């Protein structure tokens, strides 16, 4: 399988449990009564193992190409999505054990179809019941709609009509309130159930951001955009507050998502019109100084400077975010989460580029949770440094695997397709590709964070090699590597060739006498 590199990371976990195929959702789940008064708890900043049991209703192996559940995760330590997988057993159950770092967003993927997001907490056990045909129906309807180009009838320099600027609430358009495809038990079940049934598919809140992005850059709306956007925010919050379907925890969660989207709208508006953050606004004139102070006051009044925003992580970690928030809040005013996540983003990048951190820099992190994460990355980097590869790779492989047939997998931890194929291949090493002459080599570079790379090295059998950028670039050129994963085959005579993802060539070469 060839796939352009995308920003997903993947890890694998499989446990087989005996039982029977579920024909329907258990009655105890269907009859569960939500606690309508329970508030949204503070987000968890801790590391613990989370267990997710995915039950496919009316399961048959013929329902999937790969009988694997992909669980896409973004926790409080990762700047890209992680992906854990579980094999679906004969009973339609996939058991996935996750070393979770803080509260996480999750979605289920089966083949090329995926679910809406739900929440996982470290230490919880969550059961997810899936109506796979219904999930595919909704997912494909969603993807078809995303491919449609919406024409709002006005450009950046046009004067839009009142009708064109009319905002409307995005609702769940796929009938999930009466025909859901996910049911939850354990963990954040109430909140997950509400978001799945009543929130827009794969969105955090009811903003129409396609229209919003068009409005904020229109030059004729510049003077009124912020006021109109804030009116919209207030309207949405009122609608949420009076929605009797929602328990208190969901009202607080969705209301926070609206506030965060208002914050991001204002940030994007300032960035577009003033080419940067609030500090970019020229305050030399009295009018501009007042305007700058007004924007700062609005941002402070949104109430988003809180650790609760960890529930709805988007782009809180970036150089721009760090500069933006420093222009609105003093360092002492920033909530612990915002303070530490921007530092972690910077520190992690430096560690991955072989830079050293001082003890003073480590002490700047307020939360033990993030100090522990950073220390794990430092420890992993030290292991990698002691094993840095500096040889002639192809010649070394010829000598080390003389007379062997070697499958060389070029991959990285940001490639979803790479990891899916690694997971698929692992059990085949004991069946289809079981041969005394078979060998497996996995090659990556600095794109793969060291701590994640070490996790894969422990789990995926074979030799794992980490190259520097120059070495990787030379091999990319030699073998015309443009997509990942790419498979290079070394035959018994020591010749190397790109097999263009055709793993059958590896099997044919093994079977040669």
Please state what every model-predicted region is.
Residues 435-452, 459-471:
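Thiol-based oxidoreductase modules, predominantly thioredoxin-like and allied folds used
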Residues 404-405, 422-443, 510-513:
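Conserved helix-turn-beta segment immediately C-terminal to the redox Cys motif
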Residues 21-248:
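A non-transmembrane, solvent-exposed segment enriched in polar/low-complexity residues
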Residues 405-406, 485:
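Alpha/beta-hydrolase fold active-site loops
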Residues 1-24, 513:
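Bacterial Sec-dependent N-terminal signal peptides
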Residues 402, 410-427:
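Conserved redox-active cysteine motifs that mediate thiol-disulfide chemistry
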Residues 139-403, 431:
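Oxidative protein folding and maturation machinery
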Residues 470-511:
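Thiol/disulfide oxidoreductase modules built on the thioredoxin-like
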